[in-house]
Amino acid sequence: MQLQIHNTTRRKLDDALLCRAVETVIQGEGRHALEIAAVYCGSRMSRRINREYLQHDWPTDTISFPYGSGGNVEGEFYICLDVIEENARRFNTDFERELFRVTIHSVLHLAGYDDHLPEDRRRMTEREDSYLQQLFR
């Protein structure tokens, strides 16, 4: 798997642990990854991408663009660190845990998961919880 991590902010991130999170999901889902680009950005970039691709004029925690087909996982995702920080406060959790939850969530989208329906959201949340437990034992 070729994983490119791009951090467009000044905030320090643990690239090795982020890579491990992506690999954990890919392996756990029994999938093969080709190329994945993970972009960690601020509100301005997130808002621009959200507006351009989803016609929503606000920053969001993550936007995923899957390119893979069949059993392959390929694509890119953008995670807004400003929104992650806000959500961590709102959900009474720490920044790192929320960052990894959303990273896992993004990779699940690349692997074909959807969260439009309540049962799909529940299924994704269960997978996220499982992978978070593996990462933070």
UniProtKB/Swiss-Prot annotation:
Cofactor-binding details, from the entry: Binds 1 zinc ion.
Subcellular location: Cytoplasm
Primary location recorded for the protein, binned into one broad class: cytoplasm
Classification via Gene3D superfamilies: Metalloproteases ('zincins'), catalytic domain
Presence of keyword Zinc: yes
Keywords attached to this entry: Cytoplasm, Endonuclease, Hydrolase, Metal-binding, Nuclease, Ribosome biogenesis, rRNA processing, Zinc
Keyword Zinc among UniProt keywords: yes
Segments forming a coiled coil: none
Gene Ontology terms describing biological process: rRNA processing
InterPro entries from the UniProt entry: MetalPrtase_cat_dom_sf_prd, YbeY, YbeY_CS
Function: Single strand-specific metallo-endoribonuclease involved in late-stage 70S ribosome quality control and in maturation of the 3' terminus of the 16S rRNA.
Family listed: Belongs to the endoribonuclease YbeY family.
Name assigned to this protein: Endoribonuclease YbeY
Organism, as annotated: Chlorobium luteolum (strain DSM 273 / BCRC 81028 / 2530)
